[in-house]
From Swiss-Prot:
Positions of the UniProt region annotated as Catalytic: 200-1051
GO molecular function, one term: dextransucrase activity
Gene designation: gtfB
Localization of this protein: Secreted
Organism, as annotated: Streptococcus mutans serotype c (strain ATCC 700610 / UA159)
Protein's name according to its UniProt entry: Glucosyltransferase-I
Cell wall-binding repeats: 159-178, 179-199, 1087-1106, 1107-1126, 1170-1189, 1214-1234, 1235-1254, 1279-1299, 1300-1319, 1344-1364, 1365-1384, 1409-1429, 1430-1449
Region of interest (Disordered), residue spans: 42-89, 102-141
One BP term from GO: glucan biosynthetic process
Any one GO CC term of the record: extracellular region
Signal peptide: 1-34
Family: Belongs to the glycosyl hydrolase 70 family.
Length: 1476
């Protein structure tokens, strides 16, 4: 038994000492060959020594057990508390002293006689010994405890951001979020928090020091490769991969008996060899689970345990192979295991949203190990804007370079002259498909749609344009150009002017109009813009479009097969079906469920996903001048379901518009925006054939043609009674009857197909040719078809067969342009005749091309002139992107297979021929889809040298894939249609059109190269591919030497693991007294290299020792923890509070910006990660605690202030307004902080809350109690103006903007405002002098010279000064009296200050004069001519009466006057009674 000597740093009485610990290592073969230790002079020479290896039999087991036990007892008997050194000398172990091999070998002796076969069960002693070694090591490790971790724990407990939870320590950032993969240095100590966020001890003592010789591998002799030739391996270009199989020398037949292998006996390389111990451990655990072995190994398991476990698994595998008699199951199992390893899956490819398939790789042009894949080209991003490699200064509408190179799959190198010639060859094939395939020119395509223009070399546009001119003569006249009208899918705003400058050989989309339709009509109400963009935001300003020929030709649309369809489906899937979906990687089941939601939503009034107002968009598209409309199949028929099987709710409206276009749509165009009622509408008029302007009178046809479209995008639209919508139909249409073609109703859109159907709805123009509509005609609607308003009107009296379309001219074109946007081009209609999501046919009759052929009459009735076919290519089914899932034709591996080898989604090649011929029979031109950007996974693989890049081809920082070998699906079969037709027409094309091959292409400066016919695609013709999920380490290499395993016949590069060659070696970490060294699983010592154990990485220097701490390696900065573990994708917080970030490859990011995920960036300066407010190139930017840059968001910075950072640049906004997500506005001052309180900005007096939000439409009370109001629109402080609050109360704000209080004279009115600023209306007010005023209930004006009755029915009178009068008053000839509180006296007695009593009438309130009055007690008074109650003896109306001093008349009483005379007054009449 070997003594395994392991050295450790131990702390003993505060001193570090080196301790060597011996542990048992089982040796399962003889040492006669000696142990060869790789040193600095180690050679890669590999010689098999299997002839020197003897076999251990089961009979020797007892000797081994005794020896192992005694050695273990000796090792464990050392005194625990002392430092002991055990001799490092090693004696040669007799084979009988070694743990026996549990299996025997069945082989043929030299004399031909078969050896005795022996079979045993798995040797439990071996496993027990391995387990004991692990236990012994653990016990030895605890002899002396390193107290450095204890010191770390003391520091952790003092850190305010660290919390202990369930015995573990976590670091929380200032937002309360647990930091993961985070390291900080505090008090000189390195504290590391792992991927879970928990603190992890990374002291030197945690290094795995388990080193084993490969002689302990039970089956090494038998598992060695049969020979080193390529025939003994499954390989790719002579390189081994994680899924490579090989032929071993022996097979453990039935899991029991070793037998020599045959040429059919291949086994997975991963059954025998693994790149690291960690990979082996995971393999063992994975296979145990697959094979029903109930045992799991963790990262404390030693190498010997894993070897024994792997041997057990191998025996199980072989037994199962014998039982099943095949290895198919094993291939599936191994492949599944491979996909679990980060080095062999997308985890190590660093996928994120920088590409439609999550990432791309670029092939190196000078790969030394893959010269067959090199290229002199791969010139990237040569878009129309950037064709020369520099941004063309002529084109400024798009300030980017107008696109990017890597779109999808195998990215074709369209800068390669050989490839360019092949693209021309393919284009010629498409344009002559009928002739070539069916010997029928009537089945040829007439034109092309160029796919993904902004992702290919723009040289292709010249190549295609030159071909169309040479072969089809499109530059000669309009008829030739229109007969071969080709279009581009080019999204950059620079592409159309570029195309125009290139001669308008093809036309591009009017993307501005598409966006206008989208945001003015199709979006939800709260996202809609105004309607004016529909008039002006386009390639054509349609305010008054009266030109014979537009400046630039174009086509227009609102939706397409891949625009506003698959993105909506994606949104549905992500929101309601699978929130974890990435990009466009859907399953068919997810798509099916999404369409159930999509189709239901289409029928809803309040839509969540689908477009609003589709019919309104088409009403403009199909009546607009100066652009060719393209109708999308999915707007007339459901996107899913069988072809043309199910109509949408918009079908009738669109069909009606298509048919009406033939009869009516012609002449000049005028559009207007009118503000009416509470919203706006737009009108669009076509004047009719022969009339370009409103003043043109035209002819008879003019009068019966033309159209008016009226649209609104507000469902709450209401016109005022006085509003008039005036639509000027033009001078040709004076006093003419018009009828509706389409009108909005409560239930949707009503179509009127004839004059008779609309007879009751006829309207007439006036003598100026104006149609006038009122509130009775136009209002907003909300239903599944319309969210707003639509009305389309046409003249009455047009013949049923009227056709106002214009034929193209054959007169020679002389302006150097091919396509002209004139009346003839305006007359064309394109039909995009497919949906990405239409169902797969279940029978012949359902194939798209079969259905098309049956419906050509319908297409002709619609006026379709150009039928855009789906891409007819047989689809890839690799499922790597949506296109290959739904098999729409854009994902293909053979560009010449148009249903030739088998039916595609749309039918067979013969079906295609019939469909084209049927369309041609109706005069409809047919357009092919030319897709030169990409090709999907080919059936054959190549090893390429690749670098992980973003969509522009720029290397992705932090990726492990940097000029590494990578397996790509880049080679076609050589037996497909490409092999037949590739390059086949180049000689013919050179003979017919030599000028095509003489032109030097712009991006390369050289012509196309027709000398090579591409019969088989391979990597040299591609720029690269999407990441394939195979990982950075799929092509296997030895970590220690960084040499790839290769089985080439060239001995210079033929290289294999020592294990496969039955050579002895060491494996794992070891401490040699100076430092830690490492031997790879291939048997080589690591020097000047990184080593990975699973996801853990280390570096070993020039002397082979593991490094720790900060290191500069080849000019790059790295950081390694005390146990050698490299920081990767980790943040290090230095003791000075600064941060550093170490990427996926462990490199410290040094300077500049780096993208980490879609739209997320970090910035670095000399290795320091920017955190907080940072000045960069004079601009202030913000980075959070994780270093992520704030873009397009508000941030509360450390000073507590709110700031906003630009969505694109990340620069802090200064001195400008910004709107937040809630639609609230903030103003950012000179320092970038959101201002608060009162502010004067640009002459406006504004107010901002403490949170920075601008006050609009609200009242604000300042610290002095002053009230202000800020306008609901501008936010300006209201001054010298009235404002009414939500409760209907009014305020008036003075010249300073403060609400006035008290009595005020405003605009000649005398008003009053309470202390809270509220104007008094319909209320009484008593001022500080006690004066009472009343303010009118409507105007609020102080009442003057007027009576007012209060709520209790009491009356007041306010004098000329507006104050309530008191006391006796003569008003309007009446003598009245008002109490001290201003209340008029009515029906009451009043005694004045002189004691005079008056009475005021209960109705009029007039003072009673010359009249009797009886009070409530029945007493009578008489008031004289002055209105005072009389007293004493009075003669009234001839009666002698008497009234007391209080005015009460005496009745039935005696009275003695002042002279002592006694009188008596009658008890009834009160008259004095004479006494005789």
């Amino acid at each position: 038994m070997d003594k395994k000597v392991r050295y450790k740093l131990r702390k003993v009485k505060k001193r570090w000492v080196t301790v060597s610990v011996a542990s048992a290592v089982m040796t399962l073969t003889t040492l006669s060959g000696g142990l060869v230790k790789a040193d600095s002079n180690e050679s890669k020479s590999q010689i098999s020594n299997d002839s020197n290896t003897s076999v251990v039999t089961a009979n020797e087991e007892s000797n081994v057990t005794t020896e192992v036990t005694s050695k273990q007892e000796a090792a464990s008997s050392q005194t625990n508390h002392t430092v002991t050194t055990i001799s490092s000398s090693t004696s040669v172990v007799n084979p009988k002293e070694v743990v026996s091999n549990p299996y025997t070998v069945g082989e043929t002796a030299s004399n031909g006689e078969k050896l005795q076969n022996q079979t045993t069960t798995v040797d439990k002693t071996s496993e027990a010994a391995a387990n004991n070694i692990s236990k012994q090591t653990t016990e030895a490790d605890t002899d002396v405890i390193d107290d450095s971790n204890a010191a770390n724990l003391q520091i952790l407990e003092k850190l305010p951001n660290v919390k202990e939870i369930d015995g573990k320590y976590y670091y929380y950032d200032n937002n309360g979020k647990v930091r993961t993969n985070f390291t900080l240095i505090a008090d000189g100590k390195i504290l590391h928090f792992d991927e879970t966020g928990a603190y992890t001890d990374t002291s030197i003592d945690t290094v795995n020091k388990d080193i084993v010789t490969t002689r302990s591998n039970l089956y090494k002799k038998y598992n060695q490769v049969y020979d080193r030739s390529a025939q003994s391996f499954e390989h790719v270009d002579h390189y081994l991969t994680a899924e490579s199989w090989y032929r071993p020398k022996y097979i453990l037949k039935d899991g029991k008996t070793w037998t020599q292998s045959t040429e059919k006996d291949f086994r997975p390389l991963l059954m025998t060899w693994w790149p690291s111990q960690e990979t082996q451990r995971q393999y063992v655990n994975y296979m145990n689970a697959q094979l029903g072995i109930n045992k799991t190994y963790d990262d404390t398991s030693n190498q010997l345990q894993l070897n024994i476990a792997a041997a057990t698994i191998q025996a199980k595998i072989e037994a199962k192979i014998t039982t099943l008699k095949n290895t198919d199951w094993l291939r599936q199992t191994i492949s599944a295991f491979v996909k679990t390893q980060s080095a062999w899956n997308s985890d190590s490819e660093k996928p994120f949203d920088d590409h439609l398939q999550n990432g791309a790789v670029l092939y190196d042009n000078e790969g030394k190990l893959t010269p067959y894949a090199n290229s002199n080209y791969r010139i990237l991003n040569r878009t129309p804007t950037n064709q020369t490699g520099k941004k063309d200064p002529r084109y400024t509408a798009d300030n980017t370079i107008g696109g990017y190179e890597f779109l999808l799959a195998n990215d074709v190198d369209n800068s390669n002259p050989v490839v360019q010639a092949e693209q021309l060859n393919w284009l010629h094939f498409l344009m002559n498909f009928g002739n070539i395939y069916a010997n029928d020119p009537d089945a040829n395509f007439d034109s092309i749609r160029v796919d993904a223009v902004d992702n290919v070399d723009a040289d292709l546009l010249q190549i295609a344009g030159d071909y169309l001119k040479a072969a089809k003569g499109i530059h000669k006249n309009d008829k030739a150009a229109n007969d071969h009208l080709s279009i581009l899918e080019a999204w950059s705003d620079n592409d159309t002017p570029y195309l125009h400058d290139d001669g308008d050989n093809m036309i591009n989309m009017d993307n501005k109009l598409r966006l206008s339709l989208l945001f003015s009509l199709a979006k939800p109400l709260n996202q809609r813009s105004g309607m004016n963009p529909l008039i002006t935001n386009s390639l054509v300003n349609r305010t008054d479009d009266n030109a014979e020929t537009a400046a630039v030709p174009s086509y227009s649309f609102i939706r397409a097969h891949d625009s506003e369809v698959q993105d909506l489906i994606r949104d549905i899937i992500k929101a309601e079906i699978n929130p974890n979906v990435v990009g466009y990687s859907f399953t068919m089941e997810e798509i099916k469920k999404a369409f159930e939601i999509y189709n239901k939503d289409l029928l809803a009034t309040e839509k969540k996903y689908t477009h609003y107002n589709t019919a309104l968009s088409y009403a403009l598209l199909l009546t607009n001048k100066s652009s060719v409309p393209r109708v999308y199949y999915g707007d007339m028929f459901t996107d899913d379901g069988q072809y043309m099987a199910h109509k949408t709710i918009n079908y009738e409206a669109i069909e009606t518009l298509l048919k009406a276009r033939i009869k009516y749509v012609s002449g000049g165009q005028a559009m207007r925006n009118q503000q009416v009622g509470n919203s706006e509408i737009i009108t669009s008029v076509r004047y009719g054939k022969g009339a370009l302007k409103a003043t043109d009178t035209g002819d008879r046809t003019t009068r019966t043609s033309g159209v008016a479209v009226i649209e609104g995008n507000n469902p709450s639209l209401r016109l005022k009674a006085s509003d008039r919508v005036v639509v000027n139909m033009g001078a040709a249409h004076k006093n003419q009857a018009y009828r509706p073609l389409l009108l909005t109703t409560d239930n949707g859109i009503k179509a009127y197909h004839s004059d008779q159907e609309a007879a009751g709805l006829v309207r007439y123009t006036n003598d100026r040719g104006e149609l006038i509509f009122t509130a009775a005609d136009i209002k907003g609607y909300a239903n599944p078809q319309v969210s707003g308003y639509l009305g389309v009107w046409v003249p009455v009296g047009a013949a049923a067969d009227q056709d106002v379309r214009v034929a193209a001219s054959t007169a020679p074109s002389t302006d150097g342009k091919s396509v002209h946007q004139n009346a003839a081009l305006d007359s064309r209609v394109m039909f995009e005749g497919f949906s990405n999501f239409q169902a797969f046919a279940t029978k012949k009759e359902e194939y798209t091309n079969v259905v098309i052929a049956k419906n050509v009459d319908k297409f002709a009735e619609w006026g379709v002139t150009d039928f855009e076919m789906a891409p007819q290519y047989v689809s890839s089914t690799d499922g790597s992107f949506l296109d290959s899932v739904i098999q729409n034709g854009y994902a293909f591996t053979d560009r010449y297979d148009l249903g030739i080898s088998k039916p595609n989604k749309y039918g067979t090649a013969d079906d295609l021929v019939k469909a084209i011929k049927a369309l041609h029979s109706k005069g409809i031109k047919v357009m092919a889809d030319w897709v030169p950007d990409q090709m999907y996974a080919f059936p054959e693989k190549e090893v390429v040298t690749a670098t992980r890049v973003d969509k522009f081809g720029k290397p992705v920082e932090g990726s492990q894939i940097k000029s590494v070998l990578y397996v790509a699906d880049s080679k076609s079969s050589g037996k497909d249609q490409q092999a037949k037709y590739g390059g086949a027409f180049l000689e013919e094309l050179q003979a017919k059109y030599p000028e095509l091959f003489a032109r030097k292409q712009i991006s390369t400066g050289v012509p196309m190269d027709p000398s090579v016919k591409i019969k088989q695609w391979s990597a040299k013709y591609f720029n690269g591919t999407n990441i394939l999920g195979r990982g950075a380490g799929y092509v296997l290499k030895d970590q220690a030497t960084n040499t790839y395993f290769n089985i080439s016949d060239n001995k210079e590069i033929n290289f294999l693991p020592k294990t496969l060659l039955n050579q002895d070696s060491q494996v794992g970490f070891s401490y040699d007294g100076k430092g830690y060294v490492y031997y790879s699983t291939s048997g080589y010592q690591a020097k000047n290299t990184f080593i990975s154990e699973g996801d853990k990485w280390y570096y070993f220097d020039n002397n082979g020792y593991m490094v720790t701490g900060a290191q500069s390696i080849n000019g790059v900065n790295y950081y390694f923890l005390s146990n050698g573990l490299q920081l990767r994708d980790a943040i290090l917080k230095n003791e000075d509070g600064t941060y550093a970030y170490y990427g996926n490859d462990g490199r410290r990011y040094e300077n500049g910006y780096y993208q980490f995920m879609s739209g997320v960036w970090r910035h670095f300066n000399n290795g320091e990660m920017s955190v907080g407010l940072t000045v960069i190139d004079g601009q202030v930017q913000y980075f959070d605690e994780m270093g992520y840059q704030a873009k397009g968001k508000f941030v509360t910075t450390a000073d507590g202030k709110i700031r906003y950072f630009d969505k694109q640049s990340g620069n802090m906004y200064r001195n400008r307004f910004i709107e937040n997500e809630e639609g609230k506005w903030l103003y950012l001052g000179e320092d970038g902080a959101a201002v608060t309180g009162s502010q004067t900005i640009n002459g406006q007096h504004l107010y901002f809350r403490a949170n920075g939000v601008q006050v609009k439409g609200e009242f604000v009370t300042d610290r002095y109690g002053r009230i202000s109001y800020y306008d609901s629109n501008s936010g300006d402080q209201i001054r010298n103006r009235f404002v009414r609050n939500a409760q209907g109360q009014w305020f008036y704000f003075d010249n300073n903007g403060y609400a006035v209080t008290g009595a005020r004279t405003i605009n000649g009115q005398h008003l009053y405002f309470r202390a809270n600023g509220v104007q008094v209306k319909g209320e009484f007010v008593t001022d500080r002098h006690g004066r009472i005023s009343y303010y009118d209930g409507n105007s609020g004006d102080q009442i003057r010279n007027r009576f007012v009755r209060n709520a209790q029915g009491q009356w007041f009178y306010f004098d000329n000064n507006g104050y309530a009068v008191t006391g006796a008053r003569t008003i309007n000839g009446q003598h009245l009296y008002f109490r001290a509180n201003g209340v008029q006296v009515k029906g009451e007695f009043v005694t004045d200050r002189y004691g005079r009593i008056s009475y005021y009438d209960s109705n009029s309130g007039d003072q009673i004069r010359n009249r009797f009055v009886r009070n409530a007690q029945g007493q009578w008074f008489y008031f004289d001519n002055n209105g005072y109650a009389v007293t004493g003896a009075r003669t009234i109306n001839g009666q002698h009466l008497y009234f007391r001093a209080n005015g009460v008349q005496v009745k039935g009483e005696f009275v003695t006057d002042r002279y002592g005379r006694i009188s008596y007054y009658d008890a009834n009449s009160g008259e004095r009674v004479r006494i005789n």
